[in-house]
Design a protein with these regions (language model features):
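Short connector loops at helix/strand junctions that flank enzyme active sites
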Residues: 31, 45, 52-56, 66-68, ...
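Short beta-strand micro-motifs in enzyme catalytic cores
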Residues: 32-36, 70, 134-136, 157
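Long hydrophobic alpha-helical segments typical of transmembrane helices together
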Residues: 167-196
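Unchanged
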Residues: 46, 56-58, 63, 92-178
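Conserved Nudix-box catalytic region and its N-terminal flanking loop in Nudix hydrolases
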Residues: 2-4, 14-16, 48, 67-105
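Acidic, metal-coordinating catalytic segment for phosphate/diphosphate chemistry
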Residues: 21-60
């Protein structure tokens, strides 16, 4: 059966939904959930359940003291995924905190590392179909190691992994975390382009 050809969205598709009502149905420590009644641009009324989150920061910490860059990866158990995952250091932005301040705090808390040079290199939505969480990936360079202060419920192993090995871990299916995949691939492409 031939597939239907899709045409490009018309300008009218850019209209914003009209929120008719919004009710918080859950409020927790990390996120809340709202059930919103909205009117679509075509006039249809629908219910949208949205997980509300303050946003997250991700730290692409790179050690450049050797022959090739090494990426700081963490290995920790994630209850929701029910497995140990390789990730970049990351965390939630606290109320009233800037993304950069949150990134600096999370890097120290989780790993003990500090960085002298910071630059936001990526910004994206984690899963925009039902979640408003944004993620900012910060490149952190010129690292020095101090003492970590992870939260009581965090058990994190830190590893400096050569970039080629981190790429192999992605392409061999050992890294399942989307933000880690995005950050490591960004670094490899930035180096390839001469932008690093």
């Amino acid at each position: 059966m031939p597939s239907k050809k899709r045409s490009a969205p018309k300008k009218s598709a850019k209209k914003v939904l009209k929120v008719l009502s919004s009710k918080t149905v859950y409020k927790g420590k990390v996120f809340s959930v709202t059930s919103d009644k909205v009117q679509e641009p075509n006039g249809v009324t629908a219910t949208r359940d949205v997980i509300r989150h303050s946003g997250s920061v991700v730290i692409l910490a790179v050690d450049e003291t050797g022959d090739e860059p090494r990426v700081l990866l963490e290995r920790q158990y994630r209850y929701a995924a029910q497995e140990y995952l390789w990730e970049l250091p990351a965390g939630r932005i606290d109320p009233g905190e800037s993304a950069l301040a949150g990134a600096k705090r999370e890097l120290i808390e989780e790993t003990g590392y500090r960085a002298k040079k910071w630059k936001r290199v990526l910004f994206f939505y984690a899963s925009p179909g039902f979640l408003n969480e944004t993620m900012s990936i910060f490149l952190a360079r010129d690292l020095t190691l101090g003492e970590a202060a992870p939260e009581e419920d965090e058990s994190i192993e830190c590893h400096l992994v050569p970039l080629p090995e981190a790429l192999d871990m992605i392409f061999n299916g050992k890294i399942h975390d989307g933000k880690a995949i995005a950050g490591v691939l960004w670094l490899a492409e930035a180096i390839r382009r001469g932008d690093f």
